[in-house]
Curated annotation (Swiss-Prot):
It holds the Pfam family US22. It comes from Human herpesvirus 6A (strain Uganda-1102). This is Transactivator protein DR7. Induction: Detected as early as 18 hpi. Belongs to the herpesviridae US22 family.
Length: 357
């Protein structure tokens, strides 16, 4: 129905236009496709209703369920070129249990268009034709207003591999003239990802633009130290290869005493609910393993071996992270590449339980 003049409008507007055309025309050649289109709209409505019911957390989710192609991550996102960064706003998934099921990487085209790459489905979607439009319209858009997903080579057989993600993003950059996400650097607003422009060879990257990822203001004081600690772990030329911060995990930190219920009074002080929240950045590496970095403590560890494991575990993956090799826990001589800067004494186990709670 792309030829119809109202293509791209909200579904209810399309239905009204189709009904108006059907009621005004007597030509069967025009009426038949219009009726077919109205029936297909009804199917889309039913499908969307089931989709929203499946993701429901409260009654309002039926009305405000986010479209599948929305960027659902607990991040502030700022887009722009150079030092002038244009804030987009707080982006958060309100209707999904796990933030991992909806991890996306935001991309900016050389022409200024904004794209989003859905990691799990290995799909690239065009969000807006410019950062200004993206800022104005934001992510609270109806699903039908999104442009169609871009055609990419279907390699989802190895979709759980991190290398596949880099390959897809590199291919998208070459095919659709995009800027891909590279390393991490520090700005006044927080941590920013360098946008790298691929020239010819997908593995050749040239700095082109900058995108900033920041968190709520209470964590601003953590950024300089966190960035320094992260650079200490993931130094230049690291064996794990290129890396990027692709999301933020948060869960209630396990404490000895359980948190009081919401709206209870403890010592004449009303408590807002769980107060200790553990936050970890999800770091994707080219070599494969997904890392978790705790900005408040500077700890870093292997979170999962693949996205499939991470999707299966959800935020619960943060509970068992000390089962992997970590500084102070690995055997002498068995230094994992992530821990090569920590040199334990050869011949005996390290006594100091570093990086542990």
């Amino acid at each position: 129905m792309r030829h119809l003049p109202f293509h791209g409008m909200p579904l209810r507007v399309q239905m009204f236009c189709a009904f108006f055309i059907r009621s005004e025309t007597t030509d069967k050649n025009k009426a038949t496709p219009t009726i077919t289109f109205m029936v297909s709209c009804c199917f889309v409505w039913v499908k969307r209703l089931f989709y929203r019911v499946g993701r429901i957390h409260h009654v309002q989710s039926l009305t405000y369920a986010r479209p599948i192609t929305a960027l659902d991550s607990c991040l502030y996102v700022c887009c722009g070129y150079g030092e002038k960064l244009q804030p987009v706003g707080f982006v958060k998934s309100y209707v999904t249990n796990s933030q991992l099921d909806t991890l996306r990487v935001l991309l900016v085209g050389k022409d200024g268009a904004v794209y989003v790459h859905h990691m799990r489905a290995a799909r690239l979607c065009r969000l807006a034709s410019s950062t200004t439009e993206f800022t104005r319209r934001g992510l609270q858009r109806d699903a039908v207003t999104y442009e169609e997903d871009l055609e990419l080579p279907d390699q989802r057989m190895c979709g759980t591999n991190a290398r596949h993600l880099f390959d897809v993003i590199a291919a998208a950059a070459d095919e659709h003239n995009l800027l891909t996400v590279g390393g991490l650097c520090q700005t006044h607003a927080g941590v920013s990802c360098n946008l790298l422009e691929t020239v010819g060879d997908p593995w050749t990257a040239v700095p082109a633009a900058r995108m900033t990822l920041t968190v709520p203001q209470v964590q601003y004081r953590l950024w300089p130290e966190a960035r320094r600690d992260l650079r200490r772990h993931l130094y230049a030329g690291h064996p794990l290869g290129p890396w990027l911060v692709c999301g933020v995990l948060s869960r209630e930190r396990e404490t000895q005493k359980p948190s009081p219920p919401i709206r209870t009074t403890v010592g004449n002080v009303p408590t807002p609910g769980p107060r200790e929240v553990e936050i970890a950045w999800v770091v994707l590496t080219l070599a494969g393993p997904l890392l978790a970095f705790w900005p408040d403590t500077g700890k870093i560890c292997r979170l999962a071996n693949s996205f499939s494991t991470l999707w299966k575990m959800g935020p619960r993956a943060m509970r068992g992270h000390w089962t992997y090799s970590a500084p102070g826990r690995h055997l002498p001589g068995d230094a994992w590449p992530l821990c090569e800067h920590v040199r334990p004494q050869v011949g005996k186990l390290p006594r100091k339980r570093a990086y542990l709670d």
